[in-house]
Amino acid sequence: MCAKQQQTLLPTRAAHGRLHRNRDAVAWPFSTLCRVSGPTLFQMTFTAALWVAVFGKCGPPPAIPNALPASDVNRTDFESHTTLKYECLPGYGRGISRMMVYCKPSGEWEISVSCAKKHCRNPGYLDNGYVNGETITFGSQIEFSCQEGFILVGSSTSSCEVRGKGVAWSNPFPECVIVKCGPPPDISNGKHSGTEDFYPYNHGISYTCDPGFRLVGSPFIGCTVVNKTVPVWSSSPPTCEKIICSQPNILHGVIVSGYKATYTHRDSVRLACLNGTVLRGRHVIECQGNGNWSSLPTCEFDCDLPPAIVNGYYTSMVYSKITLVTYECDKGYRLVGKAIISCSFSKWKGTAPQCKALCQKPEVGNGTLSDEKDQYVESENVTIQCDSGFAMLGSQSISCSESGTWYPEVPRCEQEASEDLKPALTGNKTMQYVPNSHDVKMALEIYKLTLEVELLQLQIQKEKHTEAH
């Protein structure tokens, strides 16, 4: 009997005689039910009733971030296996959770609730402006701004807030509208190209002056902004001032009609030349719209072009009453004659010089020159005289050619043969007259040179004969 009651009514003994809650079992202190008295049995019965009351109870609904129970908010305890539904706070949405809590038999709440901030729609791009913000979730704020030259029309901020069952931006998105300048300023004696009442940012206009006036300053101004949004014209407009030409000043020239102390646009004068000069250009000139005279003439001494020279050139300088021309020669040529000629009263005075080629001094060994100089000019002749005991091989007279070389070639002075060797030069037998082999060799060399000279002379004569015919 005692064993049966122990199996049916009593839980397992608790260690150290204390009451414990351990999942689905409760234990309290007693040794056996075989020997119980009345008070002891009452105590055991009360404890069993208390165990039934405590086991499986959950406390108030748990506090979950951004969520609240859908019902039974004020209850403080719930039976085991109780299920409570939760709802997300406004501005938050459920994820993949079941959105409920469950009271487990152990008296603990099992939570399956998750709420996250909802997203407002992406604001996208703002034409001609900027959208700044870190997130677009519930509670966040974005700011709007415009590029330079544009004005923000609408609110500069918008917040993601609750709207009905969802979230939306608190303010409509603004626009960036281009700024416009008013009419450009007018100018005296001129006008601008604008025809509108208002001109958008970066739009420009140009100014022109009336006839007889010229523009001072930049002809262009544009619509711009200060502080990024205040429209202003970029600069002050130009001005138009009356066109004035200075007195025409022409060397050797004079105004014969139309003289004024001040000349304005389209005024004209007639000019003439003095001192025997001739007018080159138009006699009548006009004050132009740019403040300059139309092509000014010149008064020149009416000489033809100075004569050109071969292998040389000239430079000219015009003075008050005379024109001077200076001649110079190319490299390798020397000026022969006066280097300067002049034009006065339409006539050249003096003869143009010549540029003649330069030949270097001929080098002749064992001989002398008829005229010794470091350089010789074209067509200049030189005669060569061989020293005593030397015979000339070549032409005695040579001339400086236009190419700067001597013609014919510079001759040579060779040592004459002795009396004993003269028969060798005439072609006679030599061995009976020559004392030794050295003299024989020299005689043969001299004879060879003589033949070469004679051959050269024959060729020259032949060429001259050919040129003559």
Curated annotation (Swiss-Prot):
Tell me where in or outside the cell this protein is found.
Secreted
Signal sequence, start to end = 1-56
According to the UniProt record, which cysteines are disulfide-bonded?
58-103, 88-115, 120-160, 146-176, 181-223, 209-240, 245-287, 273-299, 303-343, 329-355, 359-400, 386-413
Q: Which keywords fit this entry according to its UniProt record?
A: Complement pathway, Disulfide bond, Glycoprotein, Immunity, Innate immunity, Repeat, Secreted, Signal, Sushi
Q: What does this protein do?
A: Controls the classical pathway of complement activation. It binds as a cofactor to C3b/C4b inactivator (C3bINA), which then hydrolyzes the complement fragment C4b. It also accelerates the degradation of the C4bC2a complex (C3 convertase) by dissociating the complement fragment C2a. Alpha chain binds C4b. It also interacts with serum amyloid P component.
Name the source organism. Mus musculus (Mouse)
This chain is glycosylated at 74, 227, 275, 292, 366, 381, 428
Per its record, how is this protein called by name?
C4b-binding protein
Q: Which proteins does it associate with, and in what oligomeric form?
A: Homoheptamer; not covalently linked. Mouse lacks the beta chain of C4BP.
Sushi domain span? 57-117, 118-178, 179-242, 243-301, 302-357, 358-415
Matching InterPro entries:
C4bp_oligo, Sushi/SCR/CCP_sf, Sushi_SCR_CCP_dom
Gene Ontology terms describing biological process: complement activation, classical pathway; innate immune response
Cross-referenced SMART domains, in alphabetical order? CCP
Quote the gene name from the UniProt entry: C4bpa
UniProt GO cellular component terms: extracellular region
Q: Name one Pfam family in it.
A: Sushi
- Would the keyword Glycoprotein turn up in this protein's UniProt record? yes
